UniProtKB/Swiss-Prot annotation:
Substrate binds at R234, V235, G236, D237, T257, G258, D259, G260. One of its GO terms (cellular component) is lysosome. InterPro entries: Ntn_hydrolases_N (IPR029055), Peptidase_T2 (IPR000246). It comes from Mus musculus (Mouse). Glycans are attached at N38, N310. It catalyses: N(4)-(beta-N-acetyl-D-glucosaminyl)-L-asparagine + H2O = N-acetyl-beta-D-glucosaminylamine + L-aspartate + H(+). The gene is Aga. This is N(4)-(beta-N-acetylglucosaminyl)-L-asparaginase. Cleaved into an alpha and beta chain by autocatalysis; this activates the enzyme. The N-terminal residue of the beta subunit is responsible for the nucleophile hydrolase activity. N-glycosylated.
Amino acid sequence: MERKSNLSLLLLLLVLGMPLVRGSSPLPLVVNTWPFKNATEAAWWTLLSGGSALDAVENGCAVCEKEQCDGTVGFGGSPDEGGETTLDAMIMDGTAMDVGAVGGLRRIKNAIGVARRVLEHTTHTLLVGDSATKFAESMGFTNEDLSTKTSRDLHSDWLSRNCQPNYWRNVIPDPSKYCGPYKPSGFLKQSISPHKEEVDIHSHDTIGMVVIHKTGHTAAGTSTNGIKFKIPGRVGDSPIPGAGAYADDTAGAAAATGDGDTLLRFLPSYQAVEYMRGGDDPAIACQKVILRIQKYYPNFFGAVICASVNGSYGAACNKLPTFTQFSFMVSNSLHNEPTEKKVDCI
């Protein structure tokens, strides 16, 4: 019955003209969100050099942290309301079902490296804030300022625009007109839809990466500096297992990118892997995840990448006026170099 249901969905998507971008190849396989080619290349060469799936994810994400991919990964981007850049990252071992993650990491540039140390040197899953920084220092990471002229200028400009946009509601003074500090307004007004400015696809460009090793071992990971002008302490989907990324050797791996506050509520990466476990092609699994979120948040910004343990892969995204196509990178034995793929949003 499940197979019949999957076939029916596939036929429906084709009839409606919904695009399917899918592929397959002999293992190994690297897939990551956005056209971050250097990250893909680093992960791929790690595999060719004998590294593990975890090594590939860590090295790939670390490249984006160093290169400050699109200003939304690594230091010097997405300042919070106080002007500080903080980092979120996670890495997951789909063989042992083990995870290491950091949220709101301060003053440490290599967030994915710290997440790997959480996985390898603790029995915890997630460390946050100043305590995560202390842990990182104990592991040999350097404490240094994550702000740059670019992030300071972004923050100054935001203040000059009366702190617009921001993420407050039901407070005084009116957050749509004034900066804080804020306090509760005394009454709650239920929003019909979440506060959204015109979507800037460069405000949520988490790198999410999935790797299928030639042995079939899987790994997944993410790294991001979050959203611009977030309320200090905010953590999105990226460092949360099942939300930002997920991997399981018995099915596959997936990662998400976009509006983390919305994505976090649906565990899209876990859901995609479970769809693949049930027999769905990765492209179909990704689309089913997007369609599921659409029911509640039709205007959400997000995309998902999926890869099965047999080397098949796919992606899907939610269509908006300013976001109609999603680019992602693939590296496998069929290509001499990382290849950019595009999928039309649904």
